[in-house]
From Swiss-Prot:
Keywords from the named record: Allergen, Cytolysis, Disulfide bond, Hemolysis, Hydrolase, Lipid degradation, Lipid metabolism, Secreted, Signal
Signal sequence range: 1-18
Matching PANTHER family: LIPASE
Source organism of this protein record: Polybia paulista
Name of the protein described by the UniProt record: Phospholipase A1
Distribution of this protein across tissues and organs: Expressed by the venom gland.
Entry GO terms, CC: extracellular space
Length: 322
């Protein structure tokens, strides 16, 4: 049995199947919350708001559209994703769409039993990915938004949902998304899967992975660049004791701080298990990469170790620039 499931099995393995939530939902349960500089608190995207707010009028279709996709037991109005959305619109006037599929992610009830709905939530990721892809097609064909201007950011299960959206748009004969940022992609039910069954580096032109928990997240290299924050395991500031959920969530906070601040979280080349990372002081723009929205502009590819501090903005390299 996979270690990541063993505790749940020990505690709940003998429960009647009828007690395990199935987290059913359909496409009508998926909401899009839109954030712009004019709608800083977010509005629910509907046909009416599309027309009334003219979100994709000709004068704005050239700007970047960013989808944010939450994970298990979460929702599109989670404070961490709101903070990220607001950082994005302040940074560069992005149009941000937070995807809310909370029913399918088992967030409908605050119950311990919700954790047992994980396998159903895993299956729902494909449906959400297809829904995002279908909406992407609408943006491209009806509103003339370029695929090169669309970015997906997903945390945990949301990272794989983004990957499935990336696969689906290619099936729809669209170009690839410009970027997918996988924030500690969920490990259980995915870490031994091949590319068709998880987020993969071929799902977008550039796939950035931020690893923060080797318990709840995938630990293997799956992106164009894979950043292992504090070696991709226990994160500073998450307490002395075992706290995988805190480390898992740190991936969202790291990217948000990279968006908000000029300080660069520098990744230095690292061959997992086989080498000690080189000191950041030896980095050049050709060998190392800054975590964040502009990672694609650096030529280096592969796996990178990133030292981080316990508190925001988490930079461990004050005064060092690439």
């Amino acid at each position: 049995m996979n270690f990541k499931y063993s505790i749940l099995f020990i505690c709940f393995g003998t429960l009647d199947r009828g007690l395990i939530p199935e987290c059913p939902f359909n496409e009508y349960d998926i909401l899009f919350f839109v954030y712009t500089r004019q709608q800083r608190d977010g509005i629910v995207l509907t046909e009416e708001t599309l027309q009334n707010y003219d979100l994709f009028k000709k004068s704005t279709i050239s700007r970047q559209v960013v989808f944010i996709d939450h994970g298990f037991l979460s929702n599109g109005n989670n404070e961490n994703f709101i903070a990220m959305a607001k950082a994005l619109i302040e940074k560069d006037n992005f149009l941000v769409i937070s995807v809310d599929w909370k029913k399918g992610a088992c967030n409908a009830f605050a119950s311990t039993l919700d954790y047992l709905g994980y396998s159903t939530a895993v299956g729902n990721t494909r449906h959400v990915g297809k829904y995002v892809a279908d909406f992407t097609k609408l943006l491209v064909e009806q509103y003339k938004v370029s695929m090169s201007n669309i970015r997906l950011i997903g945390h945990s299960l949301g990272a794989h949902t983004s990957g499935f959206a990336g696969k689906e748009v290619q099936e729809l004969k669209l170009n690839k998304y410009s970027n997918i940022d996988g924030l500690d992609p969920a490990g259980p039910s995915f870490d031994s899967n091949d590319c068709p069954e998880r987020l993969c580096e071929t799902d977008a032109e550039y796939v950035q992975i931020i690893h923060t928990s080797n318990i709840l997240g995938v630990y293997s290299k799956i992106g164009t660049v894979d950043f292992y924050m504090n070696y991709g395991s226990h994160q500073p500031g998450c307490g002395r004791f075992f706290s995988p959920s805190c480390s898992h969530t740190k991936a969202v906070k790291y990217l948000t701080e990279c968006i908000k601040h000029e300080c660069c979280l520098i990744g230095t080349p690292w061959k997992k298990y086989f080498s000690t990372p080189k000191p950041i002081s030896q980095c050049t723009k050709d060998t190392c990469v800054c975590v964040g929205l502009n990672a694609k502009s650096y030529p280096a590819r592969g796996s990178f170790y990133v030292p981080v501090e316990a508190t925001a903005p988490y930079c461990h390299n004050e005064g060092i620039k690439l």
